[in-house]
Amino acid sequence: MSLLNDRADRAGHTAIAGSATGGTAEAVQDLDRLILLGIAADLRRRTRLGDGGPHVPGAVAQDLAAAPRHQWIVEHWLAALHEHGMVSRHDAGGYHGLHAPRRAELAAARARMESARAALGYPAELADLMLRSLRELPALLRDEVGVQALLYPDGEPATAEAVYRGNLISRYLNAAAAEVLRDLAERTGRPLRILELGAGIGATTADLLPALDGHPVEFYLFTDLSPFFLDTARRRFEGGFLRYALLDIARDLPHQPGGLDLVVAATMAHNAPHVGRLLDQVAALLAPGGRVVLIETVREHPQSLTSMPFALSTAAGPPERYDARASTTRTYLRREEWLAALEDSGLRVDVDLPRQGDPLTALSQRLFVATADH
């Protein structure tokens, strides 16, 4: 990999210096197990899976009175439980033999959650989110409570900050991304033109903007699908070069071919119906030597099963996917699929972090940086 990869990696590890990473994999497993046990306990209590079987996912969803648009989530959960050995799947697609968590088992998992979230650098808000999402499963499935109410209680972003910024892997990735931007600013001989897609609460923006200090910037266009996030960002960030716009990546991107120095997409490019098509559009927007910075999850961990799927549900059900995820309920592309998609779009991959063997890889979140050579 490139010298830029080394520079970004050093910056990322400097940002988390003093944090122990040796127990990362075990901590991730503890959080995953808590959610899996919680889902299993709920399904045992409220569905026919507590009896013989096999039972098809649709029947289980009916037992749960799941709203039509959320019924796919039940099948998604059952697939995850099967993957982790907590339920058996019949050849015809039905499920049976669901694990029955004991009270002591649930208590032990909850006790381990506190040390696990601390080991991963998550503030207490993450534990609150996980436990509340388990308590609210019936209402979430019935569409009586929206996941946004869990992520932004009372309209405040503290919980979302815990998920997207205030933790070990986010600090590493954001610092590495900021170093990539700093390097670009040093190399570019004119004011920078930057587009951030799906910027959300600005968790990555907040770490990128300081990297621009002392460098000329023509504009930093902060975009999102939601006016709520744009209004929040206007109040939070200062800078005469900051601009704001509503943008839906499921539709065409702004028509500025070859005019951008940097496109940032942090934990959101997977929301595109076809990632390859999105990257083709991004590549067309970049000036020669321009870069795309992606922060992406490359494997769905069970700890997100009680939140992320609800955020993805559309009015018609599961999100439409036309890339490698078509005909599946996969949320994310794998690392190899991201690398291939970037290269297929004519971009040269310069950064792929964390390095293989780094304990941080257990969190399955990565930074990809690719350059337009055209």
Q: PLM features: what roles do these ranges have?
A:
Residues 295-353:
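C-terminal alpha-helical "lid/dimerization" subdomain adjacent to the S-adenosyl-L-methionine
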Residues 250-263:
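A short acidic, Gly/Pro-enriched loop at the edge of an enzyme's catalytic core
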Residues 193-195, 199-252:
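Class I SAM-dependent methyltransferase SAM/SAH-binding core
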Residues 276-291:
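A short glycine-rich, Lys/Arg-flanked "PGG" loop and its adjoining helix->strand segment in the class I
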Residues 340, 348-369:
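Conserved Class I S-adenosyl-L-methionine
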Residues 260-276:
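A short SAM/SAH-binding and catalytic strip from SAM-dependent methyltransferases
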Residues 1-165, 174, 178-192, 216, ...:
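N-terminal accessory segments
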